Regions:
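N-terminal secretory signal peptides and thylakoid transit peptides that target proteins
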Residues: 1-17
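C-terminal segment of N-terminal export signals and the immediately downstream linker at the start
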Residues: 24-65, 247-255
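Glycine- and acidic-residue-biased ligand/ion/polar-headgroup-sensing regions
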Residues: 137-155
Length: 255
């Protein structure tokens, strides 16, 4: 998550929309983990090394011309749901050493990174959130570990021929208008997953309602190219675009 000034500009602009109340279910126990990958039974979870080994094998397939991204995402979902992350030593260490260092922003720990994919732990205080942003040429799976969050996914519907300029922190930005289509809105609870692909639901936001911890897998990993191409959106979710269900007008900034 680089390009902090652009992100903060959009985040500040989005505060007008962040006050919308959300009703989320309280959580008392962890959900049971599904064990669907390769016929495993319910008590045969993966350890950390096995988890990485299987994703490493799967992620290599992204360079094949007939790579099925949807099938890959489903396999990663199944792997994540076989993992008891709080029992992994590296995750235990991150949990134990947690400090809320970044006011109004989540804490990020990189659990594993290679060119083909990365695994991260994100920890949120109540009130911290990630506003709408995309992941160019990437696909990803979020796995909720503790807490709960409202997750919204969008796809770019069309660009609009409408721009304006605005200044923030001494820098002038051009705001470009577009229309986004909501593809999914869900409340994630422990053991549940949310997905995005490079072509569907690639723009998402995440708003926890309590202290929340999640693990995500992104393929390929973040690099200078996809970081530079990432866009942060301000979405007007109050009104449907042209009164069409699931369509919303949005703006994004170019410096």
């Amino acid at each position: 998550m680089e390009h902090n000034e652009r992100r903060e500009f959009i985040k500040m602009s989005a505060l007008a929309f962040a006050g919308i109340a959300i009703q989320l279910n309280s959580i008392s126990t962890f959900a049971q983990h599904a064990n669907l990958f390769q016929g495993r039974t319910i008590n045969q979870g993966l350890n950390w090394d096995a988890f990485l080994s299987k994703i490493t094998q799967l992620a290599k397939e992204q360079y094949q011309p007939n790579w099925d991204q949807n099938s890959y995402i489903k396999n990663v979902q199944n792997l994540l749901q076989q993992c008891q992350f709080p029992e992994f030593e590296n995750v235990k260490k991150e949990f134990a050493s947690y400090e809320n260092k970044n006011k109004d922003w989540f804490e990020h720990a990189l659990l594993h990174k290679e060119i083909n994919f990365q695994v991260s732990l994100l920890q949120f205080e109540k009130g911290e959130y990630i506003s709408h942003h995309n992941h160019p040429d990437m696909c990803g799976v979020i796995n909720m570990v503790t807490g709960n969050a409202l997750v919204k996914n969008y796809s770019l519907h069309k660009e609009l021929e409408k721009t304006k300029t605005q200044s923030y922190n001494g820098q002038t930005y051009t705001l470009i208008s577009c229309v986004l289509e909501e593809t999914k809105k869900e409340i994630l609870t422990p053991g549940k997953t949310s997905i995005l692909t490079s072509t569907k639901g690639n723009i998402h936001s995440l708003m926890p309602n309590e202290f929340t911890q999640l693990v995500d897998v992104f393929t390929p990993s973040y690099n200078e190219k996809n970081e530079a191409a990432s866009i942060w959106y301000q979405v007007n979710e109050e009104v449907n675009f042209e009164n069409k269900s699931k369509l919303f007008e949005a703006e994004y900034a170019l410096s």
